[in-house]
A protein has these predicted regions:
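Bacterial N-terminal signal peptides
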Residues: 12-23
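Serine-dependent carboxylesterase/thioesterase catalytic core
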Residues: 112, 116-187, 191, 196, ...
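Short amphipathic alpha-helix adjacent to the substrate-entry channel of hydrolases
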Residues: 403-419
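Short, well-ordered alpha-helical scaffold segments within catalytic/effector domains
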Residues: 372-375, 406, 436, 440-443
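Bacterial N-terminal signal peptides that target proteins for export
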Residues: 2-14
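Flexible, membrane-associating and regulatory peripheral segments of lipid-active enzymes
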Residues: 25-389, 398-404, 420-423
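Intrinsically disordered, low-complexity regulatory regions enriched in Ser/Pro/Gly/Thr
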Residues: 382-384, 414-415, 457
Length: 570
């Protein structure tokens, strides 16, 4: 019994000793399953699956898993930085696809930690401070963004699977976003360096630190303004409020930017106060048409190489600038990919900065800062192969009247492929006959400039869209007056012989016209073809007395009166 009792005590002691020795084992310590389960909501699942450094400020689940596989989740990669990036680059235990996508995100995390000048815009979308010199962190920041772009590019086109094979994977969408953001930031930094004189090289080669950017030839069909922009604004940095209902984009490859040009109509269409006393003879001739001064563009960085190693060592990427209205797809290493585009940002930024609403009212009532002649704006660079859709606003209005109509037209693929949108901006205090005549002359100048032979598609089958007073002008453009207007005035108005002769010589060109041959269709919106009863009411007459003719019209009348030797009181 004593032996048996001693043996039992010994076995018990041995078991306790073993259990104590294995106290560090999670299974024995917890006396539970090695895998446990918990419920998550659909929102939590999507956030965990799709969240990354851009959306949540934390590394994505895919990158964290890659760090664990490489044994880097603790130690060197406990904090973001170059040591972690170098360790991941040297790892040999992860697939290239996982490595490149993770490195793109790690470089992005590092780039976001570097100090950057804060971009601030006023309510009109203008930068509050101009860049006059580059900051000390400019080059490290550019290097980091270029590494993001290069690693993402390598993942998309030079790893085990093609982009098409990964088409529905969230990871590819994340890495594409990394590439687009990196190209956006690098493009803006390159522009800032160019604006401050830091870029070296020839016209088509820009050297900045270790990088040499090779400017690719423009698209064959593109007519983007070749001038140097006064600003380069990322479309993603702009948020629009007010009457604009929606922002229209096309998901794809590339950085969506807005190139802000100096507006030739900003100084020519507006009569400056200092010129208020100018005469017809001294008033300078100005171009009556121009492209919208803030065209949208999409920028790509194309890294060269026959294999992954060559791409990862390419420090001379090709810089491609595309017109998203002309180009919908690009070919990258044998794969067709959609080109990213923002069809609203440039148009909305132009309207936000134009101050059209106040200017149109100042014009109507003869205030300073109004306009005195019609001006034609092209919403996109001229395209000879697309028909023209010309919009004419109404009384006391401006191109802002078309903000949502034009925005919806620009987003429609079929309409965008078939038409180019133009808009007339004209002083609505000017007599309709004179506005109509000026618009006809402007259209003639535009078509003569772009298509002297008249054979282009743009010179045929134009569609006019006129609202209110603009509809009346549109109707005149498709009408034939013959001698009716001149004869009616001669028969009904009491005029001196000198006035009659002046009407025949000076007034006939304005009052005699034929249908515009370029126009094939007209859309009228709330157009008073038979006039309006409101004009004859007390309110209408009171408002009419507030309207003032443009200074240029008064000067023209005075000049004609002097030429005809007519007393101005007549």
């Amino acid at each position: 019994m004593a032996t048996t009792g001693l043996g039992l005590i010994g076995r018990t002691t041995l078991i306790i000793t073993v259990l104590l020795a294995l106290g560090g084992c999670a299974t024995l310590r917890q006396f539970g399953p090695s895998v446990q389960v918990a419920s998550v909501t659909p929102g939590q699942y999507i956030a965990l699956k799709r969240g990354d450094i851009l959306t949540s400020g934390k590394l994505s689940a895919a990158t964290i898993e890659t760090l664990r596989v490489a044994g880097l989740d603790e130690g060197v990669c406990a904090k973001p930085g170059l040591p972690c990036i170098e360790a991941m680059e040297s790892s040999i235990v992860v697939r290239e696809e996982d490595k490149r996508s993770s490195l793109a995100e790690l470089w992005l995390q590092y780039a976001m930690t570097l100090p950057a000048p804060k971009r601030e815009y006023s309510a009109s979308g203008r930068a509050k401070t101009a860049i006059t010199e580059l900051d000390a962190d400019f080059q490290p920041r550019l290097d980091a963004w270029m590494q993001v772009a290069r690693q993402a590019y390598a993942y998309l086109f030079f790893t085990e699977r093609t982009a098409n094979q990964r088409g529905f994977e969230d990871r590819q969408t994340q890495v594409r976003d990394y590439y687009n953001l990196a190209v956006q930031e690098a493009s803006v930094q390159l522009y800032n360096a160019y604006a401050t004189g830091r870029v070296h090289g020839q016209a088509s080669h820009f050297q900045l630190g270790r990088w040499t950017f090779v400017l690719a030839p423009s698209d064959e069909a593109s007519a983007l303004d070749q001038r140097t922009p006064s600003e380069l604004v990322p479309a993603a940095s702009l948020s629009f409020t007010g009457t604009l209902r929606s922002v229209h984009r096309r998901d794809g490859f590339g950085a969506e930017l807005v190139a802000v040009m100096d507006d030739p109509a900003g100084s020519t269409a507006t009569t400056p106060p200092a010129a208020a006393q100018a005469t017809q003879a001294s008033r300078p001739a100005t171009q009556s048409w121009s492209e919208m001064p803030s065209p949208s563009m999409t920028v790509l960085l194309r890294f060269s190489g026959k294999n992954l190693w060559e791409v990862l060592h390419d420090d001379e990427p090709e810089l491609e600038i595309h017109d998203p209205y002309q180009v919908a797809e690009v070919t990258l290493h044998g794969q067709q990919v959609p080109l990213a585009a923002n069809f609203t940002a440039g148009y909305a930024l132009w309207l936000a900065r134009s101050n059209f609403s106040r200017q149109s009212l100042r014009t109507l009532f003869g205030g300073k800062g109004g306009i005195d002649t019609p001006h034609l704006y092209m919403m996109q660079p001229y395209d000879p192969n697309r028909r023209v859709l010309l919009m004419i606003h109404g009384l006391a209005s401006s191109p802002e009247a078309w903000v949502n109509v034009a925005n919806e037209l620009l987003r429609d693929d079929e309409i965008r492929q078939e038409f180019q949108v133009w808009q007339f901006y004209y002083p609505t205090n000017m007599p309709i006959a004179m506005s109509h005549d000026a618009m006809r002359h402007t259209l003639a100048e535009v078509f003569k400039h772009f298509d002297p032979s008249g054979k282009a598609q743009a010179s045929h089958d134009m569609v006019l869209v006129g609202h209110s007073m603009g509809g009346v002008i549109a109707r005149l453009m498709i009408s034939s007056s013959g001698d009716h207007l001149v004869d009616t005035l001669l028969a009904t108005a009491q005029m001196t012989p000198a006035q009659r002769e002046l009407l025949r010589t000076k007034g006939a060109p304005v009052l005699t016209f034929l249908p515009e041959p370029e126009v094939s269709r007209v859309v009228f919106i709330a157009t008073p073809h038979r006039g309006t009863d409101v004009a004859g009411t007390r309110l209408g007459r009171w408002i009419g007395r507030l309207v003032r003719l443009p200074l240029t019209v008064l000067e023209d009348v005075a000049t004609i009166a002097n030429d005809g030797q007519i007393d101005r009181n007549d």
